[in-house]
Amino acid sequence: MDFMNFFILGADLPTLGGVKGWASDVVIQFITIVVMFIAAKNLMKLKMGGIIFVCCIGSAVTWVIKHWSEFSGWINALMEKL
């Protein structure tokens, strides 16, 4: 049994926190790619307002993903006020 514990610990398998961080990074990278694509599409049409709007929405969504606990606290406080 000790050998199995040594084997599992030696494999350096990711923990649940590591998997959660990895998934968060993948989602943020996907959002970045989508924002760059839509911004390039608006650039071809010379729509500066569209580029600025897409960058603002993309950065807001990225911030919410990175700071989910703070954002959910704000939503919870807002729901309690109502």
Curated annotation (Swiss-Prot):
Record keywords, A-Z: Cell membrane, Membrane, Transmembrane, Transmembrane helix
Cell membrane in keyword set: yes
Location(s), subcellular: Cell membrane
Topology relative to the membrane: Multi-pass membrane protein
Bilayer-spanning residue ranges: 22-39, 46-65
Entry GO terms, CC: plasma membrane
Listed name of the protein: Uncharacterized protein YddC
Originating organism: Bacillus subtilis (strain 168)
Lineage: Bacteria, Bacillati, Bacillota, Bacilli, Bacillales
Gene from which this protein is expressed: yddC
